[in-house]
Amino acid sequence: MVADVLLTHFNQLFCLNDPGHPLTGQEMKKATIVEDGYIAIKDGLIVALGSGEPDAELVGPQTIMRSYKGKIATPGIIDCHTHLVYGGSREHEFAKKLAGVSYLDILAQGGGILSTVRATRSASFDNLYQKSKRLLDYMLLHGVTTVEAKSGYGLDWETEKRQLDVVAALEKDHPIDLVSTFMAAHAIPEEYKGNPKAYLDVIIKDMLPVVKEENLAEFCDIFCEKNVFTADESRYLLSKAKEMGFKLRIHADEIASIGGVDVAAELSAVSAEHLMMITNDDIAKLIGAGVIGNLLPATTFSLMEDTYAPARKMIDAGMAITLSTDSNPGSCPTANMQFVMQLGCFMLRLTPIEVLNAVTINAAYSVNRQERVGSLTVGKEADIAIFDAPNIDYPFYFFATNLIHQVYKKGQLTVDRGRIL
């Protein structure tokens, strides 16, 4: 077979054999590091991988050849938890955070999510599209090729649908692949304050059926937290969403442990998000139910909290984990997955291999894209992040710098030395 593109002489390729399930426990610690590696691409797919000189049959007169001495290649990074589409920003809350005002106190004062809801409701489709596109561009420049994007800053049908429509438009227009999550249950809207059940009924009866019919989202999510939605309320919504055919995610155990993990395990959610306050018993429940733990260390960093999710304990117990940005305008205003990956080492005490497995193959399982992306594997799409680094450890050791040299998306050179092509 003659390749369309042949990438050669990488110092290292980060490869693994996808075992057919998210990596857990000792599997998280393993990878195949190919020295002097090459990747052959045809029709957007990886058709060969190896070490040394590629087979002569891969090279034809039209084959594009590129050498990457001094560079490493990983699968394209996957950010599987973002609140991508929103209006406004919340830097005016930063001084309050520095003064020690808590996230929930800011929310109670009408700030936080509700502040962004007001800004998003007043934002046009074009405003939201352009703002979200800029964030996606930034992510792409940092090696991200697939992104999960939630609604949740509308809390009414008109605005929630506008957010989902923006995600759908960007999925068509932008190189990054987007996976849509419907999260109208991100907070209790002011017009339903004191009556969250009535709001959930509106979501179930009026919103979810349309989202499903128009294929606007693949997943449904809810914020199960003190002063937001209870475990029973979360169970009520997610069970109805599951009946309609949605895959499930749940924000749980971020600030307090109030039963969100039980809901995730009972309903076989694909992932439970945050988990800073998770208990040993709850870790066992998620393992038993096969729920992926999606950890968001940049949120803990941004909130200036001391308690990070117990990633080391989770992995050692046999749990599958991922890492994501939680990109949003309030509790985590960043879109930099390289920073999150570095926090995975510095604050969660994971190894570079564990982090790379978390943000590639496990993240692919978290967004139901494991058949297409998540590993440098023959037959999968050629989503490749190329780092200006001599080895796999270097992008973690040399932190706070964008080390992306190039990005390939479906076999196309998409980012070249800081420019989107």
UniProtKB/Swiss-Prot annotation:
One GO CC term, this protein: cytoplasm
SUPFAM superfamilies linked: Composite domain of metallo-dependent hydrolases, Metallo-dependent hydrolases
Cofactors (names): Zn(2+); Fe(3+)
EC number: 3.5.2.7
The keyword Amino-acid biosynthesis belongs to this UniProt entry's keyword annotation: no
Residues at which N-formimidoyl-L-glutamate binds: 153, 328, 330
Cofactor note: Binds 1 zinc or iron ion per subunit.
Keywords: Cytoplasm, Histidine metabolism, Hydrolase, Iron, Metal-binding, Zinc
GO molecular function: imidazolonepropionase activity; iron ion binding; zinc ion binding
Residues noted as binding 4-imidazolone-5-propanoate in the record, renumbered to the chain: 90, 153, 186, 254, 331
GO annotation, biological process: L-histidine catabolic process to glutamate and formamide; L-histidine catabolic process to glutamate and formate
Pathway where it operates: Amino-acid degradation; L-histidine degradation into L-glutamate; N-formimidoyl-L-glutamate from L-histidine: step 3/3
Record-stated family: Belongs to the metallo-dependent hydrolases superfamily. HutI family.
Protein name: Imidazolonepropionase
Organism name: Streptococcus pyogenes serotype M12 (strain MGAS2096)
